[in-house]
From Swiss-Prot:
Its cofactor is a divalent metal cation. GO terms for biological process: defense response to virus. Part of a type VI uridine-preferring CRISPR-Cas system. The active site is at residues 445, 450, 1016, 1021. Keywords: Antiviral defense, Endonuclease, Hydrolase, Nuclease, Repeat, RNA-binding. Its EC number is 3.1.-.-. CRISPR (clustered regularly interspaced short palindromic repeat), is an adaptive immune system that provides protection against mobile genetic elements (viruses, transposable elements and conjugative plasmids). CRISPR clusters contain sequences complementary to antecedent mobile elements and target invading nucleic acids. Unlike many single-component effectors, this CRISPR-Cas system targets RNA. CRISPR clusters are transcribed from pre-CRISPR RNA (crRNA) and processed into crRNA by this protein. Pre-crRNA processing is metal independent, while crRNA-guided target RNA cleavage is dependent on divalent metal. Residues 908-1120 are annotated as: HEPN-like fold 2. This is CRISPR-associated endoribonuclease Cas13a. The keyword Signal does not apply. Belongs to the CRISPR-associated endoribonuclease Cas13a family. The gene is cas13.
Length: 1120
């Protein structure tokens, strides 16, 4: 039996109309049909929902006109599909679905044999409500009296109507006439549901103080500011008759059979009966109505009816005390969320004009700002490592930074400097250079944490920096602050020296990747003389462009596919080889990669004709393929004047629409496949057009050629970019790439020519930093004082008896080899933590046993064997069911995996992986603390505004009952009337009163106390890395959850993000239930993720990482 539930949901900015059905026989809920209403195309225009404080409406993209009526009319066919799914309970019965669909829409009337339907037991295929008589009142009924009620027995009606059919096939004209009773019901149903959805859209407003809920929250806020309790949960419970309701709910629960999957429906029905009894009170009393809403949410949370595979809830969640506790928390949280929302709108100065477009714009701006803040935190941590590694406070604070020079070690500073900069520095220049680096980070950090409209020009074009020194003036020691222009210091020479070296850096990259060993100067110059070519540091201006690795490997698959099973014939010629163990191929691959990023992408993603020709080719080819033409049918053509970036945004938005829907995963693959094919074909055409196909045929040079190579390079970067370049030099490649990607997304919305130019140059700066950012040390003496220091360091990772041989020393057994992983952990400050980790067990060190694993067998033979077996499976998929054959396949991939894990350990690559994992985890935590900083501003400034205070905060400040801070930095607190004056509570009694009221209000709401501020600081300042914090990474995640406890979604997101990061590193983690661990994160299992071979259902699989590596990571997460 089926029960239907209708709901309208607004999820991730997309409006859906959902049909859920519960099957009593199979005891599960399924989502029968989800009808998307927004972010679909109608008349080739994207539909969006636009909301403001007055209500919602459906609009077309880039238009504000209300088109709700027109769009809903266009969506009528989707309603017909919904009715079909509502009528037929077994979606797999195609004949019955075609029959019903033909009744509802003439253009869906297909040729159906009468016998194909009459042979079925029709009743078995009907939804439960149609198995017996159904009663309804037409919409135009004057009232709901008996005389207007219409009865339908669909099963009988269908049988009688089918008996009247005389021919072999259904006669739609006569059949529709006989089925008129059902058709009328369907039209009535669609009409009523259309009105319901329109009403839901109209009511989908952005919450405001004018709404019923908003007025209640506004009243609560006044009570809190007046030091009164906003609500009395006991009093509201009595008015609501909560005791009566809980008794009824528990009685319903106890009457149900064990494992009764319908119990949650029955509980909801009991609540609805209670609501009907007090309906008048709910209408008149806003507080009571809000209380009722929270009771509903409580049942939905603990006794859900829409969740697949749900379990029967716990009766303890129906106890009056438990409900009161949770509802009390929900109401308090609702006040907090309203404060945050109003604070956000006030901060962005859009309270009166707020709509969905402005909220979307804020979302984009905040995502970029938070990414920028994270970059500042990472850069400041690297600066701290250079100046004063054990500093626990904010190193960017001018006083703290000045004091750090008392502890600075010049030799260590110069060593750290050389890992970030190619230019040499002397001891005499250290102090000035340090202040210059601080000046490149601090102004950006202090400006961007305001989280309001920023002066991007000020961000990227900072001309000066400050230096604070103690000087003796008139016999007294005083702090004197001086200001320097970047263009008048050593930084100007450093900056232009790096700019001038760009062509040389490109040549060096070609030399290290063996390109110069296989291509002549003439051939390379041909690359650099492509029409309109100029070496670009911008790469692509289009977000979501596929990586070269994906383009090449997919291109290879298409070009070399088995002719017996053709996929798409894209007419490719350049993807001829895939032999990564071949030096010649690596040279070919590297040169193609350089052309792809430096030449192809900048042109392809800005040249409309070039991009459009590739899109047209792929779409035309798809239409010509018999049996496969539906793959890209949902993708429209590129318009004549449409920019590649605009078309890619459309494709990406279409792809994102489907990624949350399980049943449409295939369509996700189609969109991704389409994007890949456009770039694969585009790159192939670009290479052929510019006569660069010789790259496919590398030929060994007798002598490497690097003379007479001319690389044209021009940039508009100038003195104004020096400061931003300095900050970028303190970021790693991942941080730079992520920052650039966010910048590309954000800059798409810019209108001002000046702003676009500023962002373009900023992206060039990032490109420059990336070009030389990951340079490694060339000599072991750059990292170590002597061999003894090298040996002491390396013996943490490698057994001492192995240090005198390859790959740790050169063939002479004496000269140390610089390991890139060791270089990396020293550069970015994870050395202290990883040394502690590897010191915890000798098992983690490289041993002779690990070296021996590399020589057990020839891994190239194993790889060839796997490729051969895989080809056999492609030709004969049935082999996956042959146990002997699959065992052979499994053994081969086990051997390959064991070799790769041993190689990763021996070459210390796993040290680099652990470094990156540590940075990823700490960076994500720092990002969450940036969100907490933002929310502190929003909530505090809203409260200060309600107090009519003339002060506002711009960061999370300490609010202490016993000890008030007298002075605040200008980036912490400012005066609305005069932002330039120094703020001091000592000189302004009213400020002291305002801050006290702010503290009391936040304390009542359990927000942002000083204990949490300390946790926030430890995370934001990366204090874990200096090894003195006394917390494990897992405990830091607990601290982050504690800081964000004011928002349940954010709090839950913290632990989810830990799972996501570990997943991206090849591991799966499960935590012990929180109720068993006093709500602390405790690892239950940490194991490798599986890679499934021979299809998802095959038992043949391999682990992404080794079990030993999982143990290392588990120790890392729990180590203090």
């Amino acid at each position: 039996m089926w029960i239907s539930i209708k709901t309208l949901i607004h999820h991730l900015g997309v409006l859906f109309f959902c049909d859920y059905m519960y099957n009593r026989r199979e005891k599960k809920i399924i989502e029968v049909k989800t009808m998307r209403i927004t972010k679909v195309e109608v008349d080739r225009k994207k539909v969006l929902i636009s909301r403001d404080k007055n209500g919602g409406k459906l609009v077309y993209e880039n238009e504000m006109q209300d088109n709700t009526e027109q769009i809903m009319h266009h969506k009528k066919s989707s309603f017909y599909k919904s009715v079909v799914n509502k009528t037929i309970c077994r979606p797999e019965q195609k004949q019955m679905k075609k029959l019903v669909h033909g009744l509802l829409q003439e253009n869906s009337q297909e040729k159906i044999k009468v016998s194909d339907v009459t042979k079925l037991n029709i009743s078995n295929f009907l939804n439960h409500r149609f198995k017996k008589s159904l009663y309804y009142f037409p919409e135009n009924s004057p009232d709901k009296s008996e005389e207007y009620r219409i009865e339908i027995n669909l099963s009988q009606l269908l049988e009688d109507s089918l008996k009247k059919q005389q021919g072999t096939f259904i006669c739609w004209e006569s059949f529709s006439k006989d089925m008129e009773l059902y058709i009328n019901w369907a039209e009535n149903y669609i009409s009523s549901k259309t009105k319901l959805i329109k009403k839901s859209i109209r009511n989908n407003r952005i919450q405001s103080t004018e709404s019923r809920s908003g007025q209640l929250m506004d009243r609560y806020m006044k009570d809190i500011l007046n030091k009164n309790k906003p609500f009395d949960i006991q009093s509201v419970s009595e008015k609501y008759q909560l005791e009566k309701l809980t008794s009824a709910l528990k009685a319903t629960f106890k009457e149900a059979k064990k494992n009764d999957k319908e119990i949650n429906y029955k509980l909801k029905s009991t609540l609805q009966n209670h609501e009907r009894q007090i309906i008048e009170e709910l209408k008149e009393n806003s507080e009571l109505n809000q209380f009722n809403i929270e009771i509903r949410k409580h049942l939905e949370t603990y006794f859900p009816i829409k969740k697949t595979n749900r379990k029967v809830g716990d009766i303890r969640n129906l106890e009056i005390g438990e409900i009161q506790k949770i509802v009390n928390h929900r109401l308090k949280n609702k006040i907090v969320q309203r404060i945050l929302q109003e604070g956000k709108l006030a901060s962005y100065e859009i309270e009166s004009t707020v709509n969905s477009n402005s909220l979307q714009k804020i979302k984009i701006e905040e995502a970029f700002a938070l990414k920028f803040i994270n970059a500042c935190l990472f850069a400041s941590n690297n600066l701290r490592n250079m100046v004063y590694p054990v500093c626990k406070k904010d190193i960017l604070m001018i006083g703290e930074f000045k004091n750090s020079f008392k502890e600075i070690k010049h030799k260590k500073f110069i060593r750290q400097w050389s890992q970030f900069f190619s230019q040499e520095i002397t001891v005499d220049d250290i102090e000035l250079a340090s202040w210059g680096l601080r000046g490149a980070i601090a102004p950006i950090r202090n400006e961007i944490i305001h989280l309001k409209k920023h002066s991007w020009k000020k961000f990227f074009n900072n001309p000066t920096f400050k230096v604070k020194k103690s000087k003796i003036i008139n016999g007294k020691t005083k702090d004197v602050t001086s200001e320097f222009l970047y263009k008048e210091t050593l930084f100007k020479d450093y900056f232009y020296s790096e700019l001038d070296s760009v062509p040389e850096l490109i040549i060096n990259k070609m030399e290290s990747s063996k390109i110069l060993d296989y291509y002549s100067s003439d051939q390379l110059n041909q690359v650099f003389t492509i029409p309109n070519f100029e070496l670009s540091l911008l790469t692509s201006a289009v977000p979501f462009a596929p990586s070269f690795k994906r383009v090449y490997l997919k291109g290879f698959d298409y070009q070399n596919q088995d002719e017996a099973q053709p996929d798409y014939n894209l007419k490719l010629n350049i993807y001829n080889e895939k032999a990564f163990n071949s030096e010649a191929f690596q040279a070919q691959y590297s040169l193609f990669k350089m052309v792809y990023y430096q030449v192809f992408l900048p042109q392809f993603t800005t040249n409309n004709d070039l991009f459009k020709s590739s899109v047209d080719f792929i779409l035309t080819l798809n239409k010509e393929r018999k049996g496969y033409a539906k793959a890209f049918q949902d993708i429209r053509k590129m318009n004549k004047d449409e920019k590649p970036s605009e078309y890619m945004s459309y494709i990406q938005s279409q792809l994102m629409l489907y990624q949350k829907k399980q049943e449409e995963k295939e369509k996700i693959n189609h969109f991704e496949k389409f994007i890949n094919q456009v770039f694969i074909k585009g790159f192939n055409s670009f290479i052929e057009k510019n006569r660069l196909t010789y790259i496919c045929h590398p030929t060994k040079n007798t002598v490497p050629e690097n003379d007479n190579i001319e690389i044209p390079f021009h940039t508009d970067m100038d003195d104004s970019n020096i400061a931003f370049w300095l900050m970028c030099k303190l970021l790693d490649a991942k941080q730079l790439s992520e920052l650039r990607n966010e910048m590309i997304k954000f800059s798409c919305s810019l209108q001002s020519t000046e702003e676009i130019s500023t962002f373009t140059k900023a992206r060039e700066v990032i490109g420059l930093a990336l070009l030389n950012g990951e340079k490694g040390c060339n000599d072991w003496k750059e990292l170590f004082d002597d061999k003894e220091a090298w040996k002491k360091n390396m013996s943490l990772y490698v057994s001492e008896e192995l240090l005198q041989s390859l790959p740790y020393t050169q063939e002479d057994g004496q000269t140390p080899v610089i390991n890139r992983s060791i270089d990396l952990v020293k550069k970015y400050g994870t050395e202290t933590i990883l040394e502690k980790l590897f010191s915890s067990s000798d098992d983690y060190k490289v041993s002779a046993k690990d070296i021996a694993k590399l020589h057990e067998y020839d891994v190239t033979e194993k790889i060839a064997q796997q490729e051969s077996l895989h080809k056999q499976w492609i030709e004969k998929p049935g082999l996956a069911r042959d146990s002997a054959w699959t065992k052979k396949y499994q053994n081969v991939i086990n051997d390959i995996s064991n070799y790769q894990w041993a190689k990763t350990k021996v070459e210390l690559t796993q040290v680099r992986h652990l470094h990156q994992l540590t940075i990823d985890l700490l960076s994500r935590l720092a990002g969450y603390m940036s969100i907490a900083d933002r929310d502190f501003q929003f909530s505090s400034n809203y409260i200060l505004e309600r107090e009519n205070s003339e002060y506002r905060v711009t960061s999370w400040i300490l609010l202490s009952e016993n000890k008030n801070k007298n002075k605040y930095n200008d980036y912490e607190l400012y005066n609305l009337k005069n932002a330039s004056i120094k703020v001091s509570s000592k000189n302004d009694p009213q400020l002291k009163v305002d801050l006290k009221q702010l503290r009391l209000t936040l304390e009542y709401l359990e927000l942002f106390d000083n204990r949490l501020k300390e946790k926030r600081n430890n995370i934001s300042h990366f204090n874990y890395l200096n090894g003195q914090l006394g917390n494990s990474i897992l405990e830091l995640f607990d601290d982050a959850r504690d800081v964000l406890s004011y928002d349940r979604k954010l709090k839950n997101a913290v632990s989810k993000s830990l799972k996501e990061i570990l997943s991206s590193h090849g591991m799966e983690v499960t935590f012990k239930p929180l109720y068993q661990t006093n709500h602390h994160l405790k690892i239950d299992k940490l194991q490798p993720k599986k890679i499934h071979h021979l299809g998802e259902k095959s038992t043949v699989s391999s682990n992404q990482v080794s079990n030993e590596y999982c143990q290392l990571v588990r120790t890392l997460l729990t180590m203090k």
